[in-house]
Amino acid sequence: MFYQYVELADKTIIAHSEIKNNNGNKSVEVQFERPRSEGGFCSARCELPSYKWIFNEYFTDDNLHFFEQFLEHNAHTLFKYAECGGIKIA
């Protein structure tokens, strides 16, 4: 399950998974998704804390670089919200 974290001005939606526990190692997957003018979506997923890209469809290298910088500034918050099941908004 993924929980919405934020929507950027360019309509990119960033969402995160719950905490995944693999042999005592905690990780979070972060999904980036944006509508394409041709139809469908640009989509990419990155695993934290390794910053390993799991897949990427249609995002440019510049986009991925921006997302990596975003993740570097938000990883601690994404882990925090992942541990409590997403941001609680009414």
Each language-model region and where it sits:
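Negatively charged, low-complexity tracts enriched in Asp/Glu with abundant Ser/Thr
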Residues: M1-I19
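Generic intrinsically disordered, low-complexity segments enriched for polar/acidic and small residues
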Residues: F2, I13, E29, N56, ...
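Sequence-level detector for tyrosine residue identity
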Residues: Y3-Y5, Y51, Y58, Y81
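Ser/Thr- (and often Asn-) enriched beta-sheet segments in non-cytosolic proteins
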Residues: Y5-E7, R45-E47, K88
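A short, structured beta-strand/loop element
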Residues: A15-F59
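Acidic, low-complexity intrinsically disordered segments
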Residues: N56-A90
